[in-house]
Amino acid sequence: HTLEWNWTDSYSYVLQPGPYTALEVQEATFEVDTSGVWETGPATANVHLSYWLPSNTEMGEQVPVIAVISPYFSYGQPGDESGATNVVGAGRGEFIYDNYIPHGYAFAQVSVFGTEESSGCFDYRGEGEGWGIHQAVEWLGQQNWSNGKVGLYGKSYEGATQWEAAVHGSEHLATIVPISGTTGLHPLLYKNGSAEARSQVMHMNYFGSTVDYNGDDLDNVCPDIIEGLFAGPVTYGMGELDPYMANYYEEREHISKALTNYNGSVYWVQGMQDWNVDPHQVFPWYQMFIDAGFDVRGMLGQWEHNYPDQWTKHNAQESGYGGEAIQNMTRWDWGQDLFEWFEYYLKGVGEKPELHAQIQRNDGEWRIEDTWPPLDRDFAEIPLDTCTQTGTRVQGVSVSGGSVSGVVIECGALSGDSDISISGLATLHL
């Protein structure tokens, strides 16, 4: 049997359109007690969100909510800002609006503290931000039109906010779908013995794009912002000697806390060629969540920092960096696949989805594994003295680019008589 997918848009669709329509957008602002999260910040702050209900709520039906929680509403410099929460977000917002509202889901867009019309400190990935996110999930799950189930969706920072929500373990948070979502700030920016150059300016870049450069900005400034401006450059320069590792970054590590506190399911989506939020943000946590009893499913493609169905971005990768997989990369079944996931975990409808990892090989072929990396793997070691090295390494380049490496190490085949499938990240011991 051949399924006919809708290929006419920039994102995928469900197989059958739903019977309902979206009602007019509604907005809500509610106050949150923040006296316990910011030592010198405001004692209260407001969360602002917008939401669209399906037309079946007019008949008294209660529906689940799919939400995107983000700093990116009204994001950017004054005069060049992105859309507010009351405008359906391009890409990920339109995908949810067009696919799932007609099937009886509410859709919400939430701005984190210190962004758009949400007040308080812009606490970049910090405790205050997570507290506001948790309160938004609680609010969505407690409305009289809600069935009490909330699912979160989004990529990158909008994937990180899902883990921030999971830390608090709301009874309303039934599932998360982090797409290349950051699980911890320190391992994002500092790994394998070195720091990324962007670590110096990440906090300032976000803060500079969320303020309006007027008197209202004073409400967005807290000690953690000042600390963040120092934490990045200090980490970049001092590495393991960085005194901020034990406090600033610990507060911004979410996944180990979610492992303890969260009670929902996880649909993990990750680009295996994503060098913005690279796969170590997911692995080995993927198996750890399975071991802890979570329902976990994965879609792991050779795309970069993109959605599974974002075909407009699945076209410019170089050989060895996903280029060989482009011809079979885009998942036009993503809308339907996710619909079945939401139906089960947010409505209790249909069969339980298979809990496996769909992993795309370098050559583009997709395979099914129980987990990733597979448990039945063997480790292979290659002594470097059997390899050849050419090139030079140049140190002392400006902080904007770090050192420049031109070293090439060539080693023999892992096996001379059989094909080898490599999974995971190779480790170099010097």
Positions of the model-derived regions?
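N-terminal cap/lid segment of alpha/beta-hydrolase-fold proteins
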Residues: S12-E61
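C-terminal, loop-rich substrate-recognition/catalytic regions characterized by aromatic stacking residues
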Residues: T29, N315-H429
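Cap/lid segment of the alpha/beta-hydrolase catalytic domain
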Residues: E61-G141, T312-G322
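Accessory cap/linker subdomain of secreted extracellular hydrolases
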Residues: T85-N86, A90-I96, P102, E164-N261, ...
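A catalytic-pocket lid/entrance helix-loop region that shapes and gates access to the active site
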Residues: G128, Y153-C222, I290-E340
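Alpha/beta-hydrolase fold nucleophile elbow
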Residues: N144-S156
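Short beta-strand/loop motif that positions the catalytic acidic residue
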Residues: Y262, W268-Q270, D274
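Conserved alpha/beta-hydrolase "acid-adjacent" motif
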Residues: W275-F283
